[in-house]
Amino acid sequence: MKKYAYFPGCSLEKVAWSYNDSSIETAKILGVELQELADWNCCGATAYSHVDQLLAYTLVARNLAQAEKEGLDMVAPCSACYKNSYFANKYIKEDADLSEHINYALEEDDLQFNGSIDVHHIIDIYANEVGVEGIKAKVKKPLEGLKVAAYYGCQIVRPRKGAEDLEDPQFFEIGRASCRERV
C-alpha cells in the first residue's frame, strides 16, 4: 500500500488528539503507511485567508513543499486542513504568478513548490485505496445492530473530485452501521 505524508494539523495535535490517535491506529490496521510531515505548520484554517490570501496560500504551500521533498502525497484527517491544503495545491498549480510569489517566499526555508503531489482526506484513502472489502477483512468486532448517525462536516466534500454528488455523498456510507436518522 502507498505511503503518505500525514498532516495532523493544529486541532488534531492539541484538542482532537483522540481523532489523531484513532486515525493513525486505523491506518496501521488497514495497512496505510503514514509518515508525519516533517516540520509542518498551521494551514491557516481560520478566517485568515480573507485577510491575506497570498500569505495563507504560502502557509499551506510550505507544508506541500515539505511533502514534495519527502516524495509523498499528503493526507489530512482534519476537514479544514484538507480543504485548505487541497484548494491551495490546486490554485498554486494552476496560477504561474501565484506559484512564483510563493516559491520566492519558500526560498527562505530552502523549499520549493513544484505541484507534484496530491492532497487527500483520510476517509478518501480508506474508501478508495483500501476499499470496502479491505476494510471488511480487518473488522474484529462487527457493529451488528448498532445504528450510527455520523457527522462529517461540509468541508470534506467541498473539493470532491469526480462524479460524487456533493449534496448526497455516498462514499461515507460504505459501512453497514450508518443510518439516516433525524438528529
Regions picked out by a protein language model, each given a short descriptive name:
Residues 1-182:
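Iron-sulfur cluster-binding electron-transfer modules in prokaryotic oxidoreductases
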